[in-house]
Amino acid sequence: MALGKNKRISKGGKRGKRGKAQETMARKEWYDVVAPSNFEKRQFSKTICNKTQGTRIAADVLRGRVFEANLADLNQSAGEEEAYRKVRFTVQEVQGRNLLTQFHSMEMTTDKMASLLRKWCTTMETTVEVRTADGYTMRLFVVAFTKPQANQQSRNCYAKQRLVKWLRMRVTKMIKRRLSKVQIKEAVSLLTRNVLSDALVRRCNPIVPLREMRIRKVRVVRTPKFDAQALLNAHGTIPTSVEADPREVEEAVEAAPAAAKAAE
């Protein structure tokens, strides 16, 4: 019979004693995510991160995180009409408990894009890549839909190919002319407040009647070398971190004994 080690009767010593279990949330810290100053609501989100321990620095972990917010929540004066657009920000710098972000991308929701599609019309799409004055390269995706002309008898409203090419050329020229002269902060304001899209509609309607013309997606594909002073200028006055109000706990009132109730 071969002799083997019986795990049930062997008494091996422990290699090391386990330390006292520490609560998970005790090792973490909360940070406020701050949007640039061209948005009305600056602190739009909170995030959590492990505290700095040894060579693992919390600021290095937080840089590069991307956060998404609804445009109607960021610009509350615009109302619910802007709720179909999602804006993303990327963290570039950590200042105390505030995360200073910069514009990352913007796009329409899927249900809004699906509601614009119709039959018997031409869908025109174009992509424009433009470089801002401070070195950011943005890629814009524009979509447009035709509509019937006045007193038209035909059911469809298809556009001729030469008009589609003409419209794409005008959209490309206008976007490059408007955005190449401004910095990223002004470019985002032109996009989020519909200044650029309204100008495109006014200039392109004489070419072909348009039912809708939207900038459905914007992406920052290339960024310049990080400049801390430029980021601080984009944020302006940074709001202080607002902590949650402490919860008030009412004192419990002891119930009277049963004997005392009976005596009463």
UniProtKB/Swiss-Prot annotation:
GO terms for biological process: translation. GO terms for molecular function: structural constituent of ribosome. GO terms for cellular component: cytosolic small ribosomal subunit. It is found in: Cytoplasm. InterPro entries: Ribosomal_eS1 (IPR001593), Ribosomal_eS1_euk (IPR027500). Pfam families: Ribosomal_S3Ae (PF01015). Keywords: Cytoplasm, Ribonucleoprotein, Ribosomal protein. Coiled coil: none annotated. Residues 1-19 have a biased composition (Basic residues). Residues 1-24 are annotated as: Disordered. Component of the small ribosomal subunit. Mature ribosomes consist of a small (40S) and a large (60S) subunit. The 40S subunit contains about 33 different proteins and 1 molecule of RNA (18S). The 60S subunit contains about 49 different proteins and 3 molecules of RNA (25S, 5.8S and 5S). Belongs to the eukaryotic ribosomal protein eS1 family. This is Small ribosomal subunit protein eS1. It comes from Leishmania braziliensis.
